Amino acid sequence: TLITSYDFRILYALKKQNPNILRGFITLQQGLSITKKNIYENSPWMVKNYPMEELFLLPNIIKSLEGHVWSTFYRDVTKQNVELAHKHGLATCVWTVNREQDIIRMIEYGVDGIITDYPKKVQEICKAKNISWF
């Protein structure tokens, strides 16, 4: 079982109740017009207040909370953060990746999962570019 949430406090409390449940931390640092971000200084979504410089290293925070999956908005991810997440044993999943160049970039970054509105498109891109990602 994997439970994911934007609210780190819920995931932290869940760990105390049942440490065997896998927990995924959903993050959004760049505000979208339709969605409010949850990662910012003094965010009520976080377990505690983190200094701004730590918020750029979310895999460190998720690891410290003994998370299992980092699920982030694809525009917030960097190759370095994916590598850091993997170093901590975290799977990385990005959302909502729909454009070809973004899909290819996420695969090149080494993410473990892509959430998209067009799964067939991801398959076709991988096949056309001879990328064995599945």
Question: Over which residues does each language-model region extend?
Answer:
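Short loop-to-alpha-helix "cap/lid" segments that border enzyme active sites
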Residues: 1-134
